[in-house]
A protein has these predicted regions:
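Structural signal for the C-terminal ends of transmembrane alpha-helices
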Residues: 35, 51-59, 122-123, 246-247
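Membrane-helix interface segments
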Residues: 39, 58-59, 138-142
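Transmembrane alpha-helix interface motif
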Residues: 1-23, 27-41, 45-48, 158, ...
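Juxtamembrane/interface alpha-helical elements of multi-pass membrane proteins
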Residues: 69-173, 180
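Interfacial helix-loop-helix linkers and transmembrane-helix boundary segments
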Residues: 58-67
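Buried hydrophobic packing residues in well-ordered domains
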Residues: 18, 62-63, 119, 153, ...
Length: 248
């Protein structure tokens, strides 16, 4: 999970798209999933995301993310079955409405989590920030904050692993199957991680200020991000995906 959103170099059409268009495509898939109400549409959007990942050469990372999300999806399914009392009883406390609602919720969870991660894998964060500033006219401070937060995710993951390894060397066992016990073991790790994050944030803010962060404008970037014909075609496909989600 530490490297799941790291940029994967490539020369595919997906890599060459305008970063804003990539975000639009990911948003269209997510909106389409929320609008869809049939298994065919939900599975279709999920298959489309995996197919795009295979084309971009990052499908193995998507599958690793799916492995992490499946237990959470199963927990959601159990909760839906336990609390949804509408419909006909299938067996025990399970109703047909609860089964249908829970299974669709699981597919939505899996489908919504992947598109944005996929787009981050095929987009450099600097390009994403600069394109949002140039094309969407987002203030640079907001784009910088968003991309910096994404950069800190793998850094904090590595620091968490380092702290856990140090604690394991002292005899702490984190491989327990008891979730409550594991939570009690993980909570104390948040204190050193929080202190480290505050220090890194302060150092980043100081470095940005010394480099004239507040003087940066849309024209400060030397690289341009024009919307080309391929980008327009992908935007049209994105609109079609939203319409398909609404219809199905």
């Amino acid at each position: 999970m530490v490297n799941v959103i790291d940029y994967m170099p490539g020369d595919t059409l997906l890599h060459r798209l305008n970063p804003v268009v990539k975000l639009g495509l990911a948003a269209a898939i997510i909106v389409g999933i929320f609008l869809s109400d049939t298994y065919v549409a939900l599975l279709g959007f999920l298959a489309l995301t995996l197919a795009l990942g295979a084309y971009a050469g990052v499908v193995d990372r998507l599958f690793s993310l799916l492995k992490l999300l499946i237990p959470l999806a199963l927990i959601m399914l159990v909760l839906q079955l336990a609390f949804m009392r509408d419909g006909n009883v299938v067996r025990g406390f399970i109703t047909d409405t609860g089964l249908i609602t829970g299974s669709k919720a699981c597919l939505r969870l899996l489908g919504v989590a992947l598109p944005l991660i996929l787009m981050l894998m095929v987009t450099k964060l600097n390009d994403l920030a600069n394109a949002c500033v140039e094309v969407l006219h987002v203030p640079y401070r907001y784009a910088f904050t968003f991309t910096t937060a994404l950069r800190f995710v793998p850094v904090f993951g590595q620091e968490m692993n380092a702290i856990m390894e140090a604690q394991t060397a002292r005899g702490v066992e984190y491989d327990t199957k008891n979730p409550i016990k594991k939570l009690k073991l993980m909570l104390p790790l948040c204190v050193p991680l929080l202190i480290s994050s505050v220090g890194k944030t302060d150092a980043t803010a100081l470095a940005a200020e010394q480099r004239g962060f507040y003087l940066r404008t849309r024209a400060s970037s030397y690289k341009r991000y024009p919307i080309k014909g391929l980008d327009i075609a992908v935007l049209a496909i994105s609109a079609a995906l939203i319409i398909l989600g609404f219809l199905f």
